[in-house]
Amino acid sequence: DTHISEKIIDCNDIG
């Protein structure tokens, strides 16, 4: 679950 949350944050940063 932690990995998924971190991935979402990374995607938002790139966007």
From Swiss-Prot:
What is the name of the protein in this document? Cystatin-2
Assigned protein family: Belongs to the cystatin family.
So what does this one do?
Inhibits papain, ficin and bromelain with an IC(50) of 0.079 uM, 0.099 uM and 0.125 uM respectively. Has antibacterial activity against Gram-positive bacteria S.aureus and S.hemolyticus, and against the Gram-negative bacterium E.coli. Reduced antibacterial activity against Gram-positive bacterium B.subtilis. No antibacterial activity against the Gram-negative bacterium P.fluorescens.
- Quote the record's miscellaneous comment: Stable in the pH range 4.0-9.0 at 37 degrees Celsius. Stable when incubated in the temperature range 25-75 degrees Celsius and pH 7.5.
UniProtKB keywords: Antibiotic, Antimicrobial, Glycoprotein, Protease inhibitor, Thiol protease inhibitor
**Which molecular function terms from Gene Ontology are attached?**
cysteine-type endopeptidase inhibitor activity
One BP term from GO: defense response to Gram-negative bacterium
PTM characteristics: Glycosylated.
User: Is the Glycoprotein keyword given for this protein?
Assistant: yes
Q: Transport: is it a keyword of this entry?
A: no
